[in-house]
Each structure stands twice: as structure tokens, then as C-alpha cells.
């Protein structure tokens, strides 16, 4: 039976025999004494294993197999380490190289690699300290998301990945089809989708919200957590074509309830990471973003300020700062606008509400002024928007009018209108992108490094 390195380091039994499996990170020698660092991914720190060629009968052939990247199983005595920077090491009795790695061609050597280089080998970059730390933080966030909602009476539901609806009304969707397109066709006007697999146009889902609302109208509080897809041709550090979304929907919740839930969830997740991923967070603080932990503590310890979009624009317009896009009423807030508000004005997270309806989704509840909607964005320092949501339109006639106003296909949304025809109620929800949260929590600057195998425009490894 073998043990994980994490278990050995956290519960050491000195002078006991241990067996571990893992991968060789580094190898060095001092005469007849060899030192290899083994890591199995269970923790940031590996453990040093010592080979004494004089005390043990190891063949030269076997020793040559001990190269960086090779997988190994070893048994030895756990002892206190005389070396600095580590408490324990293993004196090897026996070892077996399970999978060899050619040291000349293995791309991960004992040096710091650029993120650009590592993006070219996403299948191997997880073996670095940085991506191991990111993966463990992402895992913990995912677990804590479920924990939070289950503790608070929410039901987890699975919404479709293939859909006939454009949940955002933006039209930036990936089409799903089994039709054979023999020739490049820039127009879909001549295609009869009745011959397609589903008998109609089908797409990869951009959101689970609409289907989630249906279940909220019976279970009261639900959440979805799954992959979503956007065919948005954005080559930025904040956008990906495939990403994971957390989307709660709550019956009987008004906009202020929605904001309170979003704030509470965000603080719960960040607190959990600082408490339970301290080793990885210390590493990320030292090597990725100085001040990372203080940044997260500021979010946890702050009361989120709530301001209207109109007030935000007034603040931006009165500023002497040169923004890339000049702020004025009617445009969506840009990242530099959001960062200015959170970093220089309020110096903490804020919730911006009551956005103009002209650039918001059709399902958002319209305010009495008929110009703005009950939308809300949670903005945090250094990144800007991290959560977006709204109170949903629960009035059938108003929702029908809004759908027609935006020239959306009302027949495709007839089932969605049924939710207003039969037992409608005020309800709210929001979306939190997992990758953007991981990006913020770990301090990495590019969203491509927050997901194992990123999908972005003109980028589809494997």
C-alpha cells in the first residue's frame, strides 16, 4: 500500500517504512549520494528521496532511468532531513521506474518557463508548481461552490448543453449539426434544418439560466454548474470560448436579495481558499501576484457598495482620467472604468445596478423609467466584473413586448413565457464564471491559464 506525499508530510511517522508513487521533478548527485525530488500532485511541496549507492545495490542501468519527468514507485525510511527548506526525506531501499522520460526531449526542465511556452503544452504544464497550485485551487473552489449552495437549501440541477434557444439574445453561439457541408457556405438561408439531427437549428448553450428558471418555479432555489460556450471572437485575457458557469436562480428574490447572495457566496469561496489552500496561496503570492492574499482579504472584509449605473457614469465623467473609451450614459462600462471605480474611488468591491436596457438581455426586469433594467454587476478591484445578474421580468406582457422589441423569435421562447403564464413570481439570479474567479483568486493575468485545456479563437489543442 502506498501513501500520498501530502499524508506523509502532514502526518509523519519518523523511522517508518513508506511507499510513494509520483514523478521526478529534479535530480542531482554528490558522489555516491543521489537526491531526487518526487511530487505526486497531492500537495505543492514534493519530498526529497536519497539514494545511497554504497549502501544499496542499484544497477547503473536502473540509476540512468532516474530522469526528470519519469514516474517512479519507491520504498524507504522516512527520516528528519538535515537539509534546509524541508523537514523530512526518504532514504530509498528500493525503487521502480514505471514510466521513463527522455531527459533530452522532456520539455519541462529545472527552470522557469513562460506562460506562453506552457500554453503550447497544456497536457504537460500541469506538472509545474504553478499549474499544480492553480488546479488545486480550482478544485477547492468547485467543491466549495457545491458545499455553499447545499448548505443554504439550493437544489443542484443539470441544464442542457445542446439547446435551440439563445439565452442571451446576442447570437454568438456555436451551431451543432450532423449535416454534411460539402462546400463552404457563407449563408445558411438555403439549408433546411428539418433534415438535421434534431429537425431544427441546434446550438451549444451560452447559459443554463432559462432552463434553470423553470426549475426555480417549482423548487424555489436552484443552481447550475456546467460548461457554457460563446462564439465571441474576443482575443483578450478575460474571454474564453468554453468556460464553466455557476448560475443560481431563486424564486421570490428581488434585486437586493440577489446582490446579498452574490456577496455572501463570493466571500465564502474566498475565505475557504485562504483557509484551506494556504500553501498554494503562499506560493502564488510569492511567484504570481504580490499582495494577492491582502487583495482577497479586502473583498472578504468589505461591505460591498451599491451604486446605480447613472451614478457610476457621473463619477467617471467627472474624473480627469483618460479612459480608452470616453464614459457617457448609454454605453456599457469598460474594464478600465470598472477598475477605476473599485480601485481609486471606492477601494473595495461594488455592485452597479439599474443599467440601460439597450445593452442588457431581454429577460431583465424593466424599471419604472422604462429606460433601465434591474440588472446588477459585482465589480472587484484589479479585474472588474466578476458576477453579472438581474431580477428577471415576471410580467408576461412586458416580457412579450421586450422580445418583440429585440426581434427575437417569440415562438422559440413560448415555453419560457409559460413560466409567466402559470404561477409567475418575482425571481432573480446571476452568473459567476469559474475561470474568471480562478483567475482572480490565483492572480494569474490570463484566463487561458485558469482552465486545463483552453478553447479560444483559432486555438483548439487536442
UniProtKB/Swiss-Prot annotation:
Disulfide bonds: none annotated. Its main location: cytoplasm. GO terms for biological process: asparaginyl-tRNA aminoacylation. GO terms for molecular function: asparagine-tRNA ligase activity; ATP binding; nucleic acid binding. Gene3D superfamilies: Bira Bifunctional Protein, Domain 2, Nucleic acid-binding proteins. Pfam families: tRNA-synt_2 (PF00152), tRNA_anti-codon (PF01336). The lineage of its organism: Bacteria, Pseudomonadati, Spirochaetota, Spirochaetia, Spirochaetales. Belongs to the class-II aminoacyl-tRNA synthetase family. It is an enzyme of class 6 (ligase). Keywords: Aminoacyl-tRNA synthetase, ATP-binding, Cytoplasm, Ligase, Nucleotide-binding, Protein biosynthesis. GO terms for cellular component: cytoplasm. Its EC number is 6.1.1.22. It catalyses: tRNA(Asn) + L-asparagine + ATP = L-asparaginyl-tRNA(Asn) + AMP + diphosphate + H(+). SUPFAM superfamilies: Class II aaRS and biotin synthetases (SSF55681), Nucleic acid-binding proteins (SSF50249). This is Asparagine--tRNA ligase.
